[in-house]
Amino acid sequence: KASSQKYTAPLVDTPRSVTVIPQQVIKDTNALSLQDALRTVPGITFGAGEGGNPQGDRPFIRGFDAQGDTYLDGVRDTGAQTREIFAIESVEVAKGPNSAIGGRGAAGGTINLVSKRAHLGNSLDGAWTWGSDQTQRYTFDGNYQFSDTVAGRLNLMTHESNVAGRDKVNYDRWGIAPSLAFGLGTPTRVNLDYYHLESDDLPDSGIPYTIPTGGSGARTSADPSKPYAGGDHDNFYGLTGRDFRKSRVDIATFAIEHDLTDSLTIKNTLRHGNSMQDYILTQPDDSKGNVNNGSVWRRANTRVGNTATTTNQTDLFGEFYLGGLKNSFSTGIELSREESERSSYNVDTNTKGSSPTTCTPSLIGANSDYNCTSLSNPNPDDPWNGAISRNYAGTDTKSNTRALYVFDTLELSPEWLLNMGLRYDHFDTQYRTYDASGATVVNSKGVASKSRDTSEFVTGQLGLVWKPAENGSIYVSYATSATPPGALLGEGMEGNPLGNTTDRTGNLLSSDMEPEETTNYEIGTKWDLLDQRLSLAAALFRTEKENARVQVDTTSYENVGETRVQGIELSASGKLTDKWQVFAGYTYMQARQIDGGPLGKA
């Protein structure tokens, strides 16, 4: 069964594809980060910092960007970051549109991290890792029962490593996650959890791409852009004296749960989280074709980002009978406020060439103030001493969410189950733009550069399950999701697609953007075999997105077009014997753009 009470049936009877990565698989694969763990799940790929994205986790589920669809114990975890795994018990990946469970977004699915929490009993676990490239990692996981109803748990981690096959790059981080539980084994239970993670890295943007001599417009299948490092893929084109990436995450959670009766429970979860990301990293840029003459421009990508989130969820769940039919239900309300501030640095990267970004062999080194380096033999320790200053030009985005939801699994008979879910969201987001000094930008009519959007949407899920045997099921399901403008608070590839237009008198006009709408159709089967030691699943799916939002120029977005992803997924997981464990999967996907919109902009 999934950890969230919103799943009202065991996974074998849940009409959607759900993959659970248990603690044993995390240990067996030596996963050190969320990305490591998710690489064991079919249907997930990863992006990087393309298109101005912040550094951090950027998973794609079934081809759809899921950067903003990560949850911690069922609560949205906003803010770009690279997530650790030391305080995580398991990872749950639900595939297909999942807004009914998670709220806005979730076009391809959701990722839920289940925390290590205090429990009854005493346990002690520790691990250390020494490896190549100066890798050192130490973890501690201790649980202690103070009394019949009170327990505490502490998780610690420190990690230092360089990167195999890359010069100079290093990643250093440490974290602590204490947990206290009261009332264990009683009708009223309280959990207090805290999570802190800090990192200090020398980041890596990889190697440059070659551009044909005729420029990017001259690219063909025979002469494409392709990565090229001058013969040595260990080459690092950054600067050890300039580049850095620092991040910090703090999350505090207070949860209280009370059994009203043997079949009815109420739970409230209050959480506040802050995440910070601060970096300057070198992108080996070839926008001017510098690689063709053996040189590379050290472009600087920068970001200063802070995200704060406060969320309160109240859930009522349990079982009841109506007309002689059993209902397993969950209903609740969610209130949240999220704020994201984003700015950057000014970095002097002028090469002193024919243009500020042009490099030639004669400009490599001191003649360009070390903003040009050699393609085949870069020196990361160049004595770069250019100017760096804060640039407060950026945005402040604030969002408020109010949501109501209800889920029910209706047992029509021992062989037939009907799974239903419905959610209403009121999502209000607004942003303000600042200039380099930190002052609010105003237009020619003196109106502040800001905008807002209010979206209301209803999403749902419906599935019919047939159980030919107690240990198996065959299902058909339908699910929807909605992604309103500003859903990522400017923390992802979309930025802020809100209007900044005014009427003739300069009064601000609200955005008229509509939410993107995604629909999933799925048919599948699940079986628990070998006394529930082995779980098998197969599914055919089709996911369609309408109202796709596309950036048509530097400041404008439009709802145009339709896309479709369809495919098949197979999975197997379990413990066959005391010594043999299997965790396998396969996904085949076919993606198409069905309609590019009236102007073909999609």
Regions found by a protein language model. Name each.
Residues 1-121, 523:
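Acidic, small-polar-rich N-terminal luminal/periplasmic segments of exported/outer-membrane proteins
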Residues 87-89, 100-176, 184-188, 250, ...:
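Outer-membrane beta-barrel translocator/receptor signature
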Residues 124-126, 152-154, 190-192, 266-270, ...:
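Transmembrane beta-strands of outer-membrane beta-barrel proteins
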Residues 128-134, 158-162, 196-200, 272-278, ...:
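Transmembrane beta-strands of outer-membrane beta-barrel pores
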Residues 159-164, 171, 176-259, 274-307, ...:
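Acidic/polar loop-and-plug regions of large Gram-negative outer-membrane beta-barrel proteins
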Residues 181-185, 307, 326-328, 334-338, ...:
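Structural signature of Gram-negative outer-membrane beta-barrels, strongest in the C-terminal barrel
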Residues 252-274, 301-433:
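Face-selective signature of the C-terminal outer-membrane beta-barrel domain
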Residues 533-535, 539-544, 559-602:
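Gram-negative outer-membrane beta-barrel transporters
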